[in-house]
Amino acid sequence: AVPGDWQAGLVEPDEDASGMVTFDPETQEGFMLIKGLKPNDPRRELYQLWIWDQDREPDPANPSPLADNVHPVDGGVFDVSAEGEAIIPIDAKLVIGKPYLFAVTVERPGGVAKSDKSQVPIIAQPKPDA
């Protein structure tokens, strides 16, 4: 399995959020534990997980997650309740070979096929020894 800890994101970061994510490329199963992420109103917005896969990179030896030609895989949508803690199974829409970055974005109800990454409250990078 590939584990990583959540940290503040790149755009509109959530400094209070914590937790971890783990994903096993062999079984294509994983989950997220998130604490302290701002609750969302499902009628207005939801959270969506994105997974960057080194195997899908144009140049796998030099991954560049912010490049325009790099498209992360949709890992599923979820809500965070007023309790602010959630355990969410990962629902990757495509097979993931070598995940190297996980990010949560804020999107419209129903989710999106491609995020504009205008709100990225938390990210996680797999631990080097994983």
Q: Locations of the language-model features?
A:
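N-terminal targeting/export leaders
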Residues: 1-130
